[in-house]
Amino acid sequence: MEGGGGERAAGVVRRLMAAKAESRKSFSEIGEEAGLTNVYVAQLLRRQAQLKPETAPALRAAVPGLTDDLVALMMEPPFRSYHPDIVHEPAIYRLNEAVMHFGESIKEIINEEFGDGIMSAIDFYCSVDKVQGADGKDRVVVTFDGKYLPYSEQRSDHMMSRLTRKTS
């Protein structure tokens, strides 16, 4: 929950979230100002993503409380993890439930539309948006936008480690 890496990481996340609170801006507002998705801003501030040097000035402009030392820490590769109890948090539990419930159907559609492969969670964008449903009630839209990665046929003549050994 606190960005992994123990007590030091938890303290950094608390300081980052305090800087966000001082800004009085939502993740979406910060994202708009910095040119990032709202989920990526949250990932950065929770130390689940690495801040890139070219993005730092825009993020600092949006969140003035980010100190030089916090920005430097945000530029270090994070320890991506989660607390095992997080799955019991109701919003996260329901997201997991939705993926489990719809996952097999989504996988089948990916296979129909793209072939045998997966959606990347590395070359990946995610956002959360609020829209009004046909009934006028608020609805949550979670968008997963990941690069398609086809599974490889494991041909021995394409396996570089084997080709290197044969030519040595």
From Swiss-Prot:
It is an enzyme of class 4 (lyase). One of its GO terms (biological process) is cyanate catabolic process. The active site is at R94, E97, S120. InterPro entries: Cyanase, Cyanate_lyase_C, Cyanate_lyase_C_sf, Lambda_DNA-bd_dom_sf. One of its GO terms (molecular function) is DNA binding. SMART domains: Cyanate_lyase (SM01116). Signal peptide: none annotated. Keywords: Lyase. Its EC number is 4.2.1.104. Pfam families: Cyanate_lyase. It catalyses: cyanate + hydrogencarbonate + 3 H(+) = NH4(+) + 2 CO2. Catalyzes the reaction of cyanate with bicarbonate to produce ammonia and carbon dioxide. Belongs to the cyanase family. NCBIfam families: cynS (TIGR00673). This is Cyanate hydratase. The gene is CYN.
